[in-house]
Amino acid sequence: MTRKQKRLAIIGGGVGFLTAAVLLVMFAFSQAVAYFYVPGDLTKADVAPGTRIRLGGLVEAGSVKRGEGRTITFKVTDTLATVPVTYTGILPDLFREGQGVVAEGAFVGGSPVFVADTVLAKHDETYMPKDVADRLKAQGVTLGGEENIR
């Protein structure tokens, strides 16, 4: 091989390696991404069963039911729509009815029940999208710290 051919082989190998690395990173990120939805968005969104998403909203008053063992069912609402959620595990201390929550999981087997494997309780409702805050205010729900609503 001449020097020119060696250089081309090294450059070609480097480009091939870089392309493979970029494709691998893109594939890994596409598998790890969980899009955020509120219940009202799910009626418009086409979420395939088994697709991991984050579901956020308020825990509907009177909806928390404790099942066998550590299984808990509750409903997440954004005042436009409500989604039933099942979670098996220990809930965060701040979890309660009327409080903000983000559940991560998936709809399994075409069921309308969201199966969560992670539940995060929001300690403060002051940081929420303005359209959600406006809907809550229109229904008479009072919010603290309204100067922080975006």
Curated annotation (Swiss-Prot):
- The stretches that face the Cytoplasmic side, renumbered to this chain, are 1-7
Q: Which UniProt keywords apply?
A: Cell inner membrane, Cell membrane, Cytochrome c-type biogenesis, Heme, Iron, Membrane, Metal-binding, Signal-anchor, Transmembrane, Transmembrane helix
The stretches that face the Periplasmic side, renumbered to this chain, are 29-150
Q: Which Gene3D superfamilies match?
A: Nucleic acid-binding proteins
Q: Does the keyword Thylakoid apply?
A: no
Q: Where does heme bind?
A: 123, 127
State one molecular function term (GO). heme binding
Q: How does it sit in the membrane?
A: Single-pass type II membrane protein
Q: SUPFAM superfamilies, per this entry?
A: Heme chaperone CcmE (SSF82093)
Fetch the Pfam families from UniProt.
CcmE
Its cellular-component GO annotations read: plasma membrane
Task: Tell me the Gene Ontology biological-process terms attached to this UniProt entry.
Answer: cytochrome complex assembly
Q: Where in the cell is it found?
A: Cell inner membrane
* Principal localisation: membrane
Q: Give the transmembrane ranges.
A: 8-28
Keyword Cytoplasm assigned to the entry: answer is: no
What the protein does? Heme chaperone required for the biogenesis of c-type cytochromes. Transiently binds heme delivered by CcmC and transfers the heme to apo-cytochromes in a process facilitated by CcmF and CcmH.
Q: Which family does it belong to?
A: Belongs to the CcmE/CycJ family.
Name of the protein described by the UniProt record: Cytochrome c-type biogenesis protein CcmE
